[in-house]
Amino acid sequence: MAHPRKAVATPATLQLGPPAQTAQSPAATLRHSRTASSSRRLSLIRCFISCHTFNLFLLLLLLASGVRAASKLATRSNKTSGSSTASGVGAGTAATSAAAAAASGTPIWDHAIDLNDDFRILWQIINQDITFEIQARTLGYVGFGFSPDGNLAGADMAIGWVDKGQTYFQDRHVTRNGDPEPVVDPSQDYMLMLGYENATHTVLRFRRKLDTCDPSHDIAITNDTMRLLYMYHAQDPPHGSVRPGTLPDPARAFRPYRPMVLMQRAQLPMPSPTHDERVRVLELRNEDVELPAGDLPLFWCKMFKLEDINRKHHLIRYEPIYDSSSSVHYLQHITLHECQGAHAELEEMAREQGRPCLGARSIPLACNAIVASWSRGSEGFTYPHEAGYPIESRQAKYYLMETHYNNLKPDFAQLHARQMADNSGLKIYFTHVLRPNDAGTLSIGMDPNWRHIIPPGQKRVVSEGQCIEDCTGYAFPQQGINIFAVMMRTHQIGKEVKLRQIRQTEELPPIAHDSNIDVAYQDFRRLPQSVHSMPGDRLIAECIYDSSSRKAITLGGLTMKEESCTVLTLYYPRQKKLTTCHSLPSLPTVLHSLGIEQLATDSNPVLISSPPELAGMTLEARLISYDWENQFGEFQEATRKGSFKPICWGAKNHVVPGSEFLEGYSINVTKTYKKHRRCKPKRPLAPPTERTAPPPASDLSELPVLHELDNNNIIEGAARSSRSSATDVHSLSRGSGRHFISCLLWLGASSWWLLLMLRT
């Protein structure tokens, strides 16, 4: 027993050191032990009640959240299934839903395209996310993705299928080892949102970032022309396996790629001008044009006289008319020109069936304003609500349609077959209900001429068509113009086009840029916001070519074997002082770039007189014999820094005053524009597994809201029926059940622990 310490002088109420121990009786000790045990049990019971009350509260919240999410998904499923029957889309219900959507003004999908008769892709872009939906006429696996050049190697793919009610979905890529089967990415950057199949179709909806920041396996979705890859097969992989070699016959499942622009497009639903009594429709067709044999080009001109448009109308849409599926392969461009004046040749041509454009002597000057322009791959163009192209017989009654025929992939086995006749053309829609602004077309670029030289065997050749500040300063209104759409054109070796804008000596962001252009798809792009251009701006069409596959030089011209560098812009308000704003390297620049000092006078063919080592050589021979491999740098520097001839024409066949005597030079830019690529950290998704379920309710609540489809946006038979699987609802139910069972097990274990403590 411890001894008490010696007392010190302290206040009576304060005691230092441990208190003195006193002896207790056994009965008192027993009573104290029982009291402590009862207190401990009471504390445990209170702890049990508090903890379990809190956990029961959490459990109720979990169940309520699960029921609410399941109800939302079930409602969405019922909307889809309610608009269709088991065999296809219910016409009455679909019409009702479409009418309701139209009445509410809510968008359905931004864009939709049929890649073939059995495969439709729909998409919507919200901020930096893009959501796709595949509707494919198959009960096997489907795939959709992107390729940098149309080849399988390096392709970025999303693959999925539905098997026994379970959706399988993976982010994949095609390796460069020659195997066409896409393999699963180590980083899963595509998120499944919905998957089902019915008696005929498989439907998958999924989301990804425009730029997933995974350049090793994914392709960023930009304003460039994308090469869309798609595939589908009648069978699913066995047992849902995603291991290499389990995808049935991928080489045959792939279909030919389609070049397409995904971002700068007019949104759906487009207006239906044919059902508007205020809209007039006019078909401008060629008449029995004999298509050229082989790969020979043909430029055909057909004049139309429109005399019955007695008051001002606005052109609001145009689209191609194909005479037959065979003629599609021949059509390259269709351009509708507005002709000024009443020349005798215009009236003469209006009475004719048409003629080759080279036989129209004064047409290029009389018909200098472009009304509409269509290129291969385009589905037409719809003007925005703020502008339309003005049409009125008192202003212009003659319209020239120029059609460029050129079959890039001719079947020479049919060379001696009977020539086909074509009656293709343009369908235009115009209305007397005028838009707020008159629209105009301005062509910017390199004038088609032999002085536009592209050397052979080079990966990157830069050409620039300059619209100089003298011409924009003269023609543009004081408040400037608003550019709302752009079409970029090259021919077969063009790879990149940019429309640059320079104000004084500062380069502004490019008006348009495509670093992956495709000759098979050159359409007008609707800019997200109109770009303002002021008088005195310099506009430059910069084109980059890859001539590494060519052994001889390529010259500028109109045929597909020659090259082009043109950017067509649609803008408002319209002005007539400037419709063509091109440039052309000056003859001294061309000669200097080839090491030529002087040409001989009055020589035919053209001969070189100096320097002495080239004297007597023809200009054509110099073009052929020039050492392009070792002297390309000097050539490129001379053409970009040398002088050029501005070509500025207005709608009424007038040259911009003073421009015919100007000699232009490249502008000294003191502040260049550089785009910085910024990749935000990726949101981690589930690692690749053999079964990838849709995201849980918490993730689904963050996905962009997509209104269900009307009859026009569901491929026939693709609607969900009563027999369709709905894995999103089932997966959510399974997830909620697992959480509920886990909570019950936890409560049971904690109760057993409490009973054990009470017994001890």
Swiss-Prot record:
Disulfide bonds join 339-367, 467-581, 543-565. Residues 117-233 form the DOMON domain. One of its GO terms (molecular function) is copper ion binding. It is a multi-pass membrane protein. The keyword Cell wall biogenesis/degradation does not apply. It is found in: Membrane. It holds the Pfam family Cu2_monooxygen. Its main location: membrane. Keywords: Disulfide bond, Glycoprotein, Membrane, Transmembrane, Transmembrane helix. The keyword Transmembrane helix applies. InterPro entries: Cu2_ascorb_mOase-like_C, Cu2_ascorb_mOase_N, Cu2_ascorb_mOase_N_sf, Cu2_monoox_C, DBH-like, DOH_DOMON, DOMON_domain, PHM/PNGase_F_dom_sf. One of its GO terms (cellular component) is secretory granule membrane. The chain crosses the membrane at residues 47-67, 740-760. Residues 1-34, 678-701 are annotated as: Disordered. One of its GO terms (biological process) is norepinephrine biosynthetic process. Glycans are attached at residues 78, 198, 223, 668. SUPFAM superfamilies: CBD9-like, PHM/PNGase F. Belongs to the copper type II ascorbate-dependent monooxygenase family. This is MOXD1 homolog 2.
